[in-house]
Amino acid sequence: MATEYRTASWKLWLILDPRRVLTALFVYLTVIALLIHFGLLSTDRLNWWEFQRGLPKAASLVVVPPAVG
């Protein structure tokens, strides 16, 4: 049965246009990716843009070595 499926699967592309299938797949995956990203941005916990505003500046984390005199 598995051998019959592998040998006959090429017939699907005689019915479906590969260019249309790949274009539709690209559009579908792009829409899904945008929905997921905007969904994450709309939450308080997983919003990576708003999260960075509350963090201290990186300059305050710099350690200055003591002067050796």
Swiss-Prot record:
Question: MF terms per GO, please?
Answer: bacteriochlorophyll binding; electron transporter, transferring electrons within the cyclic electron transport pathway of photosynthesis activity; metal ion binding
- Where primarily located? membrane
| Periplasmic membrane side | 42-59
GO CC terms, sorted = organelle inner membrane; plasma membrane; plasma membrane light-harvesting complex
Q: Which residues form the propeptide?
A: 60-69
Assembly with partners or alone: The core complex is formed by different alpha and beta chains, binding bacteriochlorophyll molecules, and arranged most probably in tetrameric structures disposed around the reaction center. The non-pigmented gamma chains may constitute additional components.
Q: What does this protein do?
A: Antenna complexes are light-harvesting systems, which transfer the excitation energy to the reaction centers.
Q: Report the protein name in the record.
A: Light-harvesting protein B-1015 alpha chain
Taxonomic lineage is: Bacteria, Pseudomonadati, Pseudomonadota, Alphaproteobacteria, Hyphomicrobiales
